[in-house]
């Protein structure tokens, strides 16, 4: 008779969870940050709020964002005036948009990832879907399964309303699934659409205005599995270690609340300070076992919540400016796409590493770190090992 321990041993993969493909997608509507304040105050009938518009213009100018992509076009907003008002009851209109658009955008990214992977989609065993918006039943995971034509017995995991740290969460979950289920191939999808947070400006809620200056729409997808099939599957990054922690004394630092008016966004001023104060401890825990204490010797993928967070982390750790190059590039081109951001940065880094003739997918370096920051204040840490190009 076979023992339980023998069964468990047979169920486990031998090697680490490996990212085997990456795909990204954005809505067609590209928004230029320089002209966005004019559009935003016009479409929300707020042009009379001159001082507030000037404040918003300064926020946009300081954001280090050149462009963003948004599902909400001028036409859609004109058809849904309640979405443009500050705190007007509008959840029905928002839900009608996102329950369709979130899985659809996710499908676009997933199709690209599956194409790069090069294997039949029938080999996908697990699906992790993550989004901040559009809670529905059956969920976006079910809708994506139908849209892609995945097998009905794919094992699904749906993560709603986790926020900006969740790009790290999906990697942590995918790692555990891949390493504990021999032969598993996990499709990971983060799809974020800001239709649930868009609203007009208010003098009394400036944190909402910060969100209007930063957030953009995007979806990213990965294929994750252990023990890549030689000659067929091409590893991009290996996931070696993961952690999640709640930063001490950070309650209320970043909050979101689902209301009749959509998802509201609340932010304390010292979020960059809280992140930078706690990042050293997270790095020591992650890299001490590897005997790494020089954080300029590793590659960096940090959720770009905003330029102030990146600036303070760089300052605290005395990081060279090029360490955050891929992160800042994604912030500049796409804005803050919540959970999808770090996956976009992974894609940016491996592509630029190849284009620049570097030796590894991690900017020529062997080890790297990926950070997610979000509500809680929650910090996700993933230790990555690059692959030779």
UniProtKB/Swiss-Prot annotation:
Keywords attached to this entry: Acyltransferase, Flavonoid biosynthesis, Transferase
Keyword Acyltransferase: yes
Active-site residues, record numbering mapped to chain: 164
Keyword S-adenosyl-L-methionine carried by entry: no
One GO-annotated biological process of the protein: polyketide biosynthetic process
Pathway: Secondary metabolite biosynthesis; flavonoid biosynthesis
Domain of life: Eukaryota
Enzyme class: transferase
CDD domains for this protein: CHS_like
Catalytic activity from the UniProt record: (E)-4-coumaroyl-CoA + 3 malonyl-CoA + 3 H(+) = 2',4,4',6'-tetrahydroxychalcone + 3 CO2 + 4 CoA
The EC number(s) this enzyme carries: 2.3.1.74
Function: The primary product of this enzyme is 4,2',4',6'-tetrahydroxychalcone (also termed naringenin-chalcone or chalcone) which can under specific conditions spontaneously isomerize into naringenin.
Similarity remark: Belongs to the thiolase-like superfamily. Chalcone/stilbene synthases family.
Name used for this protein in its record: Chalcone synthase 2
Organism from which the protein derives: Trifolium subterraneum
